[in-house]
Amino acid sequence: MLGATVGSLATLGSAMATERAAARSQFVQWRRQHRRDAYANYLGAVYDRDVTLDAVRDALRADRPDLRDVDEKMERFVARARDVHRAAELVILEGPSSVVEALYAVVRAAADLAEVVRRMVRDAHADDTSRKAEDTALAAEREHLLYQAVKGLRTAAADVLGDSGIRH
C-alpha cells in the first residue's frame, strides 16, 4: 500500500512538473511573439517615416522648391513620426534593455537627421541657400548614421528573438 501511494505521488509530481514546464514554454512563446510584433511594428513605422522624410529631401533638391509641396510632405513626415513614437512605447514596454538601448540610438539618429531637414525647410522658406550644399551633405551623413542605428536595433532584436537570419 505504501509503495502504491509513493508511486502515485511520484506520478502526480511528475505530471505537475510537466504541466509547469509546458506552461512556462507557452509563456515564453507568447512573450517572444509579442516582442516580435512590437519590434516589427516599430521597424515598419520607422521605414514609413523615413520614406516620407526622403520625399521632403527630394522636394528640397530643386533650385526653387515648391514650398507648398514641401510643407505637405513635412506634414506627412510629422504624422509618420508620431506613429514611430507610438510604436516605440510598445518596444520600451516589451524590452529587454538591450533592445531599448538600440531603440534610443535610432531615436537620437532620427532626431539628428530631422533637425537638419527642418533647418533646410526653414531656409527654403526664407529663400536662403547659403547652407544648402552643406546641409545636403550633412543630411546624407546623418541618414547613414540612422541606417547604422536601425541595423543595430535589428541585431539586438534578433539576439533577443533568437533569429540570426534577420541580422543583415
Where are the language model's segments positioned?
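Feature marks short, highly hydrophobic, charge-poor N-terminal signal-anchor/signal peptide-like helices
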Residues: M1-A4
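Conserved non-transmembrane functional hotspots
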Residues: G13-H168
